[in-house]
Swiss-Prot record:
PROSITE patterns: HTH_DEOR_1, HTH_DEOR_2. Residues 3-58 form the HTH deoR-type domain. GO terms for molecular function: DNA binding; DNA-binding transcription factor activity. HAMAP family: HTH_type_UlaR. It comes from Shigella flexneri. This is HTH-type transcriptional regulator UlaR. Residues 20-39 bind DNA. It comes from the Bacteria.
Length: 251
């Protein structure tokens, strides 16, 4: 983990907790007490936190920003950031987007926060962030809370047509020439009901997922309008997807 990543996580801890001890930083980041104190000193010198005895406090004048605590530990984080930035450029002012769960989903929502677009989501970490940042238009899909995924799931057979959007952004555990695969069946089935009422389906997966097949087939390749992935994605799979009408964007 780089120094910049440590600093970001430390600031995220302060945003949630308001105060952290050196011991808590050591435990969370897996670093030595000396390194933890150095990080606190540097952030204190730059005015990003208030150094106190045996720890640090959040700067009260700054509005705390909520974000998943493990966001920077997500696999292929930098690539996912590029994917999210590219995806956010597709949406025009006044349009509505459906964003589902996961680290890439959160990164995309963060990119779109503050823009004149309506964000529809069942991912509570993202919804909390958008509300905290006072995003103008947020729709939270109702249903039963699923703790393992931090999402709400509506009962089987219920209508989700009220949540139609111009765009639907989703990801999964694997993408082949057959289509997109997801491992959580409840989540996948809830999202599948929306495929017929969204304008365009855009799949966001990092390059390590291309060619992988895991879980259930969520959507066939011919249902996918666009794929945004990394530059190291398997070119053979990408060619097969393009042949089926999928637009490919590598970042």
């Amino acid at each position: 983990m780089t120094e910049a990543q440590r600093h970001q996580i430390l600031l995220e801890m302060l945003a949630q907790l308001g105060f952290v001890t050196v011991e808590k930083v050591v435990e969370r980041l897996g670093i030595s007490p000396a390194t933890a104190r150095r990080d606190i000193n540097k952030l204190g010198e730059s005015g990003k936190l208030k150094k106190v005895r045996n720890g640090a406090e959040a700067i009260t004048q700054q509005r705390p920003r909520w974000t998943p605590m493990n966001l920077h530990q997500a696999q292929n984080h930098d690539e996912k950031v590029r994917i999210a930035k590219a995806a956010s450029q597709l949406v025009n002012p006044g349009e509505s987007v459906v964003i589902n769960c996961g680290s890439t989903a959160f990164l995309l929502g963060r990119e779109m926060c503050g823009k004149p677009v309506q964000i529809i989501t069942n991912y509570l970490p993202l919804a909390n962030y958008l509300i905290d940042q006072e995003h103008d238009s947020v729709i939270i899909m109702g249903g039963q809370y699923n703790k393992s995924q931090s999402i709400t799931l509506s009962p089987q057979g219920s209508e989700n047509s009220l949540y139609a959007g111009h765009w639907m952004f989703t990801s999964g555990k694997g993408l082949t020439a057959e289509g997109l695969y997801k491992t959580d069946m409840l989540t996948a089935m809830a999202e599948q009901k929306m495929l017929s009422v969204v304008g365009k389906l855009v799949v966001l997966v990092d390059s390590s997922k291309i060619g992988e097949r895991a879980g259930m087939l969520f959507s066939r390749a011919d249902q996918i309008d666009m794929l945004i992935t990394g530059k190291n994605a398997n070119p053979e799979i990408l060619q097969q997807l393009e042949a089926q009408g999928v637009s490919i964007l590598r970042v």
